[in-house]
């Protein structure tokens, strides 16, 4: 089951992005401090009271273009209605109710979606009734005053969000099928890949949308293995506004990634890695999913004996944070290497669930330390006492040390590479945590 989506909606300058950043500060799933992972997201994972959900910021409106503001606020409100389980409608308690607020509210009242009216920029909580009274005329039952900038009352807001989220459902109704998200920018060939696989194999369930808001799932069987292909292609609403289109496409993609076991990240061979590719791949990496990089339209590329290797180097240069992900070169149109791709995604999904025995793990770590001792920092030396694996999907390891502050990023990367050399983890991200031994 995909995580529920909570959309932040409102006119410009009411503090949507500030609220987004405040709520995103509670997330625990993002690995901080890793280089080359694009961070300019419009979405983030949040975990609060044992519930996980995705928050989305519907910002990006030019405040100087009045026509664009009017159209974009409407369009973003409509997208929130389509996509979200819950909507945070943000208004400005300092400046009061405006005609644009009423326009957005009119959209939201017509929907069947749950709405929390968030009155931001409340300075005096003792007299908050005076700051908020006029907003009750908008007709929403739930109203919460906050100061996103200072974090006041945001805990109460998170409590109410969790209270209003839909109940948890089963994680997966097809336990023996591998959920594979096929992601990539528009027109990279996602639908062509699904159509080729479906056309070649026996279709069990084809093109059945989970809901009108979800990606299309196609369940196929190949050589005794079942694959649930999650395709976001063809679902993106057409819009003349580029920013809104990218927002809609990104939200579809992250929902597909979130409920997958593994990800096929498709790259256009004729265009190479783009900035949009980096953003999409970055979320898959941060979400801890097994991943394969599939370079599509390879049949259209002029090749010599070095073309494939040179292309791999270029991909890893642009996606430095995905150097663990295998690269394969396919043609979704002709089917070249598509069967190999299916075997590869199954392999990396298995790698992402791999566990290592504690004794063997510590042998490898100690050998790595002997080969390259940790560098000293400010005259102090890092000591690693022992290591244990604490999780899978992705494989997560805790190193008990004398002082976590002495761990240099370069040495952390060295330890990760040592684990990969010893145990593989092909196509799987690895999480390393360092805790002080008590």
Curated annotation (Swiss-Prot):
Sorted keywords for this record are: GTP-binding, Nucleotide-binding, Repeat, Ribosome biogenesis
Q: Which residues form the KH-like domain?
A: 354-438
Q: Where is the EngA-type G domain?
A: 4-169, 178-353
Q: Does the keyword DNA-binding apply?
A: no
The name on file for this protein is: GTPase Der
**What this chain does, per the record?**
GTPase that plays an essential role in the late steps of ribosome biogenesis.
Q: Which residues bind GTP 1?
A: 10-17, 57-61, 120-123
> Which Gene Ontology molecular-function terms are recorded?
GTP binding; ribosome binding
Q: Please list the GO biological process terms of this entry.
A: ribosome biogenesis
List the Gene3D superfamilies hit by this protein, alphabetically.
3.30.300.20, P-loop containing nucleotide triphosphate hydrolases (3.40.50.300)
Q: How does this chain assemble?
A: Associates with the 50S ribosomal subunit.
Q: SUPFAM superfamilies in the record, alphabetically? A: P-loop containing nucleoside triphosphate hydrolases
Positions of GTP 2 binding: 184-191, 231-235, 296-299
The family assignment reads: Belongs to the TRAFAC class TrmE-Era-EngA-EngB-Septin-like GTPase superfamily. EngA (Der) GTPase family.
